[in-house]
Amino acid sequence: MRDETPERPAPLRFGYTTGSCATATSLAAARLLLTGRADDAVEIVLPKGQRVMMRLEFCRATADGAEAGTIKDAGDDPDVTHGALIFARVALGGARGVRFHAGPGVGTVTRAGLALPIGEPAINPVPRQMMTTHLDALAAEQGYTGGFDVTIGVEGGEALALKTMNPRLGIVGGLSILGTTGIVRPFSCSAYIASIHQGIDVARANGVAHIAACTGNASEDAMRAHYGLPDIALIEMGDFAGAVLKHLRRAPVARLSMCGGFGKLSKLAAGHLDLHSRHSSIDLPLLAQWARDAGASDALQAAIRAANTSVEALALAGADGVPLGDVVCAHALRVARDIVPASVAVEMFAIDRQGRFVGSAR
């Protein structure tokens, strides 16, 4: 019997992206410079037109401009930046327009394939546009015809970035300033999926023809050892097999290896593209049916249906000489091939909990 989903007394809270935080703090700092007014909260307009008020931790003058900071509130989303101080330092001068700089804790792009050129601060296009729109409006309101130099920072961002995919993507020195809507939707996993897409794009842009999409550290280690692939070719897909397969329709590579634990691969084989236990479960009767197709006896089929886990089912099949790992990989391969272009050579690998291969198909 499945565990019951715990009840929550209230709906999950939405939060705000680092891009929204950067917009609010840069606007507050610029307003202080142009009007002398130091706000303790600031209203911004999100990309879809919503107006939100964001609290500030500080807004103050500095020797060469002004700075403002806010605490990132990701709502009920388990975001790595939740609770971090996001700040902006703004200086006036130069030609009209906004020039962006990476402050402490914000990374710099060092590889091709991302939405920004090499050498640029890792402040994504939508947050840049949000800041530019607000600062241009402020300049027009105040009759200011010069430019803005905006430096965005994240307190502790360099350490936080080690918990993200930024180092593998070639974003060094800190975090990225992200967001397309300005809002963090709880458990939407949009940032994780975006990092999967970026990983594929970076690999392609750097001439990598063979990528390996892996569910976790053990499968990454297995692929690295098996093929000698560099880190740039290893895509940490987690539970999001569909994010990899669907992105390859738009951005194909020559060869894709997918590797995961036997249980995860059995979910993909059954047609599930989100392998998390919240969204898909292991189908033991289906495993028994596939074992039958591979020659399993009635007794083995019954034992698989009654197994406590997929690992037990695999062990039972192996003891009877039934290659259930290969069978599962073959079904997973069919699912993948129905999604990716025919030009992509696909192969599947299943591993056990010790990282040993227990099945493959190509």
UniProtKB/Swiss-Prot annotation:
Family assignment from sequence similarity: Belongs to the CbiD family.
Entry's EC annotation: 2.1.1.195
Pfam families membership: CbiD
Pathway: Cofactor biosynthesis; adenosylcobalamin biosynthesis; cob(II)yrinate a,c-diamide from sirohydrochlorin (anaerobic route): step 6/10
UniProt name for this protein: Cobalt-precorrin-5B C(1)-methyltransferase
Coiled coil location: none
Alphabetical UniProt keywords: Cobalamin biosynthesis, Methyltransferase, S-adenosyl-L-methionine, Transferase
Xref: HAMAP family: CbiD
Reaction equations catalysed: Co-precorrin-5B + S-adenosyl-L-methionine = Co-precorrin-6A + S-adenosyl-L-homocysteine
GO-annotated biological processes: anaerobic cobalamin biosynthetic process; methylation
Organism lineage: Bacteria, Pseudomonadati, Pseudomonadota, Betaproteobacteria, Burkholderiales
Family matches, as SUPFAM superfamilies: CbiD-like
GO molecular function annotations of the record: cobalt-precorrin-5B C1-methyltransferase activity
